[in-house]
A protein has these predicted regions:
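Transmembrane-helix motifs of polytopic, lipid-linked glycan transferases
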Residues: 117-138, 175-179
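Membrane-interface transmembrane helices that cradle and orient dolichyl/undecaprenyl
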Residues: 135-141, 176-193, 368
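Membrane-proximal, lumen/periplasm-facing interface regions of secretory-pathway glyco-
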Residues: 346-350, 372-435, 441-458, 463-466, ...
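Transmembrane-lumen/periplasm boundary regions of multi-pass, lipid-linked membrane glycan transferases
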Residues: 201, 213-322, 333, 338
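Short acidic/glycine- and proline-prone juxtamembrane loop motifs at membrane-interface regions
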Residues: 158-169
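Hydrophobic/aromatic-rich transmembrane helices and adjacent perimembrane loops
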Residues: 86-87, 324, 328, 342-379
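Short helix- or helix-capping micro-motifs
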Residues: 55-58, 146-154, 199, 203, ...
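Transmembrane-helix signature of polytopic, membrane-embedded enzymes
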Residues: 39, 130-152, 170-171
C-alpha cells in the first residue's frame, strides 16, 4: 500500500520515510549463530522498543553512579536547589528554568538526591526528540542508529550527572528542530507554533539557544525550499509563539541591565595578542574534536567505505531537503559559535559545545547511510556497547583512582551537610530563631542553603545586587550567617563586614571532608550576624 502524501513546499513528500533502509532479516541471519544477530534483528524490527530499553539503562546507570559515589551535591546541583526556590524570572548569570525544575523535583520528592535524576532525564528527552526527527526523515532503524551514535560524546552521559542549564537545553533544541522540520514539510500551523514555543523554552534554559535560532533563521532564508514558507503565515506564527513564551524573561533581562550577557562576557577568554585570534579558536575547535572523537570513530567504521548503491543513488527532492536540514542543524550552530568567537576575539568555553552535536550522527546516517548489511550493523552494535560500558568504567575508575592520586579536593567530598548542621545548631543556640539568610562564597553558602533544615535564602556572592529576592531591611531584622572557605580568592570578608554589619573577628570551623583518603579539612570562617532592632 502506498503511504499517504503531504505537502512539501511546492513538491510532494511521502508520509513516512524519506528512504527505507532496505533491512530484511536475511541480512543479519547471514551472520549464522552470531549472538548479536537477535539483538540487531530486534532493534531493526522494533526500534522504538529498543530505544526505550537503552534509555532506561541510561537512566539507571547515570542516576545510580553519582548517587552511590557522592557525599555532597555537585556544584551545579547545589546551586540548583539553593536558588531555584526563589522562583525568579531571571538570575544574574542564567535563565531560570533548570533551577525551577530542580526545585519542583525537590518539593515533590522531598529528597535532595532526587535531582540526580534530572540530568539523565534531560538527555533521554533529547534522545526522544532526535529519534522523532529521524523518523520524519528515514526508517525507524536508521533513526535509532542516528540517536545511539551519540553514545561516544561525554556531554550526554558522563557529564549529564551535573544537571544545570547545559543539560536543560538539550530536549528543547531537539524538539525545536523537530517541529521546525515538520512545519517546513507539512505547513501546519500547530507545528509552527510548537517550534516557536520550543525555541523559547530553549532560551529559558540557556541563552546559547541564540545560535540555534540564528541557524534556523538562516536556513529559512537561504534554503530554496524552506524559503517558500516565508510567503505563508507559518514563520510569523512561530515568531509570535516565541515572543509570547519568552516575553517574561526578556522583560527581566532588560530590567536587569542585561546582567546575564555581562556574565557571558566575563566567562569567554578575550584575545590579548594577535596570535591568540588563531590559537584561541584552535583550542575551541580542538576541544570539540576531542569530545566528539569516539562518536566520529564509531560512525566512521560503520559508514565507510560507502556502499556502492548508496554512493551512486541520486537523492529524491525530499531526501535532498532532509539531508540539507540535518547537515545545517548538525554543523550550523558550531560554525556560528566559532565564527562569532573569531570575529569578537573571544574563545568559547569548551562546555558550550553541549547542545551542538545532538544531530551529528543523524546527519551522518542521512548523508552516508543507510546502514543495512549485517557486518556494518554488527560493527555499530559492538562499538555502541563498548562505548556505553566505557563511560561508567571511566567514572568508576576515576572515583577509585582519585582516592590514591588526587591532590585537589572534590566538590562531592565537601562536608556540606555537616557544616550546615553545625552552623544551624549554633545559630539556634545563639539567636533562637530560624536561620533565614546565608551569604558568602558560592559553594559554602549554597550547601548550607540546601542542607540546613531551615533552608535559608542565599545572598549570592554576598552581593545583594545579584540577589533581588533579598529584602535587606528584613535581613537586618532577622540576621544572617556569613561564611566562606578560608583561602579562596572569591572571599571578600571586608566587603561582607560592611554589607551585613558583622562585628569582631570571624569564627573558625574545621570540618573533615567526606572521604576516607587523607586530605586537609575544610576550613570555614564565619560570622553570625544577629538581628538588629
Amino acid at each position: 500500500m502506498r503511504p499517504a502524501r503531504r505537502r512539501f513546499g511546492s513538491v510532494r513528500a511521502r508520509q513516512g520515510f524519506v528512504y527505507d533502509d532496505g533491512f530484511m532479516d536475511a541480512r543479519t541471519s547471514s551472520a549464522g549463530e552470531d549472538f548479536l544477530a537477535p539483538v540487531v534483528n530486534f532493534a531493526m524490527r522494533h526500534p522504538g522498543r529498543m530505544l526505550a530499553i537503552v534509555l532506561f539503562a541510561h537512566l539507571v546507570v547515570w542516576t545510580a553512579l553519582p548517587l552511590l559515589t557522592s557525599a555532597n551535591l555537585e556544584l551545579d546541583l547545589a546551586e540548583d536547589l539553593a536558588l531555584g526556590k526563589e522562583w525568579q524570572l531571571g538570575y544574574w548569570k542564567h535563565p531560570p528554568l533548570p533551577w525551577w525544575i530542580a526545585d519542583l523535583f525537590y518539593r515533590v520528592s522531598g529528597q535532595i538526591g532526587s535531582v540526580y535524576l534530572l540530568g539523565p532525564l534531560a538527555v533521554i528527552a533529547c534522545y526522544v526528540g532526535v529519534y522523532l526527527l529521524g523518523r520524519e526523515m528515514m526508517s525507524g532503524g536508521q533513526a535509532l542508529i542516528g540517536v545511539l551514535g551519540l553514545v561516544g560524546i561525554h556531554y550526554y552521559n558522563y557529564s549529564a550527572v551535573k544537571f544545570a542549564h547545559d543539560q536543560m537545553q538539550l530536549p528543547f533544541w531537539a524538539f525545536a528542530a523537530l517541529f521546525f522540520y515538520r512545519a517546513l514539510v507539512r505547513g501546519k500551523a500547530l507545528d509552527w507554533l510548537l517550534a516557536g514555543a520550543m525555541l523559547a523554552l530553549a532560551f529559558w534554559s540557556k541563552y546559547a539557544a541564540f545560535v540555534l535560532a540564528l541557524t534556523m533563521g538562516l536556513f529559512l532564508l537561504f534554503d530554496p525550499v524552506a524559503r517558500r514558507s516565508l510567503g505563508r503565515a507559518g514563520p510569523y506564527l512561530m515568531a509570535l509563539a516565541f515572543c509570547v513564551v519568552i516575553a517574561p524573561n526578556a522583560w527581566w533581562v532588560v530590567e536587569s541591565g542585561f546582567l546575564p550577557m555581562q556574565y557571558v562576557g566575563h566567562r569567554a577568554k578575550v584575545a590579548q595578542r594577535a596570535i591568540e585570534f588563531v590559537t584561541l579558536p584552535t583550542v575551541w575547535i580542538s576541544s570539540q574534536i576531542f569530545f566528539t572523537h569516539p562518536t566520529l570513530i564509531l560512525l566512521g567504521v560503520t559508514l565507510f567505505p560507502r556502499r556502492q548503491a548508496s554512493a551512486a543513488a541520486r537523492p529524491s527532492p525530499e531526501q535532498a531537503f532532509a539531508r540539507r536540514y540535518a547537515a545545517v542543524m548538525a554543523l550550523g550552530p558550531f560554525a556560528l559559535v566559532t565564527a562569532i568567537g573569531i570575529v569578537t576575539g573571544r574563545t568559547p568555553v569548551a562546555m558550550w559545545g553541549y547542545p551542538l552535536w545532538i544531530f551529528m550522527p543523524l546527519a551522518a546516517v542521512l548523508w552516508f547511510g543507510p546502514v543495512v548489511d549485517a557486518l556494518r550493523l554488527r560493527v555499530f552494535t559492538i562499538g555502541y556497547v563498548f562505548l556505553f560500558l566505557l563511560g561508567p568504567a571511566i567514572f568508576i575508575g576515576t572515583f577509585i583512582s582519585d582516592h590514591y592520586s588526587r591532590a585537589r579536593p572534590k566538590a562531592t567530598e565537601f562536608p556540606g551537610a555537616a557544616i550546615a548542621r553545625h552552623l544551624t545548631r549554633e545559630w539556634h543556640e545563639k539567636v533562637g530563631t530560624p536561620l533565614t539568610y546565608v551569604a558568602g562564597t558560592e559553594f559554602a553558602a549554597n550547601s548550607v542553603a540546601v542542607y540546613s533544615p531551615d533552608r535559608p535564602h542565599v545572598v549570592v556572592h554576598g552581593r545583594p545586587q545579584f540577589s533581588p529576592w533579598i529584602d535587606m531591611a528584613d535581613l537586618r531584622r532577622r540576621g544572617a550567617l556569613v561564611l566562606w572557605e578560608e583561602g579562596l580568592v572569591a572571599a571578600r570578608p571586608d566587603e561582607w563586614r560592611a554589607t551585613f554589619g558583622a562585628q569582631g573577628e570571624p569564627a573558625l570551623l574545621d570540618v573533615p571532608r567526606a572521604t576516607s583518603r587523607r586530605t586537609a579539612p575544610v576550613r570555614i570562617r564565619y560570622w553570625i550576624v544577629p538581628p538588629q532592632p
